[in-house]
Structures are given as C-alpha cells and as structure tokens.
Curated annotation (Swiss-Prot):
Top-level taxonomy: Eukaryota, Metazoa, Chordata, Craniata, Vertebrata
One function term, GO molecular function aspect: DNA binding
Coiled coil: 83-107
Protein name: Nuclear nucleic acid-binding protein C1D
Record's keyword terms, sorted: Coiled coil, Cytoplasm, DNA-binding, Nucleus, RNA-binding, rRNA processing
Length: 148
C-alpha cells in the first residue's frame, strides 16, 4: 500500500521514463552478462582483426558511457570531466574503423572487364555488315577463277 502511494506521487511522464530506464538497464545487464560469459580470448579468436577492433572499441565506448552515467548520478558534470575527451577519442577511432569498413565494401573496378563491356556496347552489327560487304566487294574485283 505504501508503494501505491509512492507511485501516485510521481507524474505519469516520470513513471514512464523510470520504467523505460529500468527496462534499458535490464537490457544492458543482459548484454554485459553475454559478453562476460565467454572469455575475451575465445571471442577474439573467432573474429578477424577488423571485427576485433570493432569489439574492443564498442566495449571501451560502452564502459566509458556507463561511467558517464555514473558521474551524472553522482552530481558531477561529465562535460567538465576527462571522460568526455576519452569518449571523443574512442569515437575518432570508431570513425576510422568505419572508413576502413566502407572502403572494403566499396565496389572495385575490373579495368579489363570494363573495357570489354564498353567495346561490346559500342559494337554495332550494321557496321560489321558494312565492313564485311566492302571487304567482299574489294575482294570480288580481284578474284581469279582457276579451272582445275
């Protein structure tokens, strides 16, 4: 009954925000448990170097973000704390990894295939017929008939 009275004291917007925060916190807790359940070395063995970098950056960013939230709950302004520079540094590396990933996904041009494609696209059957006809006419003027 005391809980009902306490809940009624809060506006519904705050109650909704608290419920959202609680569900988000549970989700984060489940993700952290999933990450911690397998050893880091086992997890890294299954990944290529780029994926390893992504995992390390994601872990560092998540940990620093949680520390940011901790500072807020303690009344410390995180914008004046060195954690802000650390998050910016991690974000810079995340952008570098994203650029590398985008470059890998970018289309590569096969010059030989492109030249064949252009050559064949420009080829015209009528031109070929005209060329064959003129060659045949020129050969026809100088044809020798031999009797065997």
């Amino acid at each position: 009954m005391a809980d009902d009275a306490a809940v009624e004291d809060y506006p519904t917007e705050i109650e909704d925000n608290l419920n959202d925060f609680d569900s988000s916190l549970s989700s984060v807790q489940n993700m952290v448990q999933t990450l911690v359940s397998v050893s880091r070395s086992d997890r890294l063995l299954k990944l290529d170097p780029l994926e390893q970098a992504k995992l390390d950056l994601m872990s560092a960013y998540a940990l620093n973000s949680m520390f940011w939230m901790y500072l807020v709950t303690q009344g410390v302004n995180p914008k004046d704390h060195p954690i802000k520079q650390e998050l910016e540094r991690i974000r810079t590396y995340m952008n570098k990894v994203k650029e590398i990933t985008d470059r890998r996904k970018a289309a590569h041009i096969d010059k030989e295939a492109a030249s064949r494609f252009v050559r064949n696209a420009l080829w015209d059957a009528d031109d070929k017929k005209r060329k064959d006809k003129t060659e045949h006419q020129q050969k026809g003027k100088h044809t020798k008939f031999t009797w065997s």
